[in-house]
Design a protein with these regions (language model features):
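Conserved Class I SAM-dependent methyltransferase catalytic core
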Residues: 7-9, 13, 130-185, 189-190
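Residue-level signal for inorganic ion chemistry
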Residues: 24, 106, 134, 192
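Conserved SAM/SAH cofactor-binding pocket of Class I
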Residues: 26-96, 102-105, 111-113
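Short amphipathic alpha-helical segments
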Residues: 75-76, 115-117, 161-164
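Mobile active-site "lid"/loop adjacent to the S-adenosyl-L-methionine
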Residues: 107-133
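SAM/dcSAM-binding transferase cores
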Residues: 184-238
């Protein structure tokens, strides 16, 4: 497939999407390819949801984002995709009129209290939205056999499994992300399915770098960047 360049406007001096979102999108592709309806939670500038929309033009793709500036960027970036709709809303207050085949989410928080972004307007942490609350709401928005595809810090694996189990979402596929072969995993990529009894499949880890040189990416990572084919444009918003 010839994937067109996805141009993404982002607010200047605000939290920007990073490689986590691109790794998550690549991981999600087998689970969303036949989806009729997809939801991107906490869409930010729209990178995840719009990649889904670009590569699945027959799917209905909804994006929900509570920050007004980021929601504006999602709306701006989504103009070329008639199969998308952006909602400015806190996900916990979001009441969609449909159920989704797949829900994707790169939560902008970490369970253990560390903060992804130093920008106060976009830094969130466990006290604002814990993973258990997120999953409970996801459950209500999924079709009976729908998928929840997400990334999270690897240290919180036990919390993730417990939260999913409490809502009868089964973690079916798991992949860890490591900076180097000899380093511990820092990120997990997970696909959980509603009302599933399947055994867990753990995929080989995604190794991101050959060396400490940030541009010395592995072949798989370079391939992911090529598949996603995104370009960021920083914009000043009042």
């Amino acid at each position: 497939m010839d994937r067109k360049l996805l141009r993404l406007y982002q607010p200047l001096n605000a939290y920007s999407y990073n490689s986590d979102s691109l790794f998550l999108y690549d991981f999600s592709r087998p689970f969303i390819k036949n989806s009729g309806a997809i939801l991107d939670i906490g869409s930010g500038c729209g990178v995840l949801g719009l990649l889904c929309a670009r590569d699945n033009p027959l799917a209905i793709v909804h994006l929900v984002e509570k920050d007004s500036k980021m929601a504006f960027c999602s709306q701006k970036n989504a103009l070329k995709f008639p199969n998308t709709q952006v909602f400015e809303s806190d996900f916990l207050d979001f009441n969609p009129q449909i159920l989704y085949d797949a829900i994707v989410c790169n939560p902008p928080f970490y369970a253990l209290g560390s903060i992804k972004s130093k920008n106060k307007g976009h830094a969130r942490h466990q006290s604002e939205l814990d993973f258990a609350s997120l999953v409970a709401k996801v459950k209500k928005c999924l079709k009976p056999k729908g998928y929840f595809i997400f990334c999270y810090e690897a240290l919180s694996l036990c919390l993730v499994i417990e939260s999913l189990k409490s809502t009868k979402l089964t973690l079916e596929t798991l992949r860890f992300v490591q900076s180097f072969k000899d380093k511990n995993a820092h990120l997990m990529l997970g696909a959980a399915r509603n009302n599933s009894k399947s055994a867990l499949k753990v995929l080989p880890p995604l190794i991101t770098h050959h060396s400490k040189n940030q541009s010395d990416n592995t072949k798989e990572v370079l391939n992911i960047y090529q598949i996603c084919n995104t370009y960021s444009i920083k914009a000043f918003l009042n």
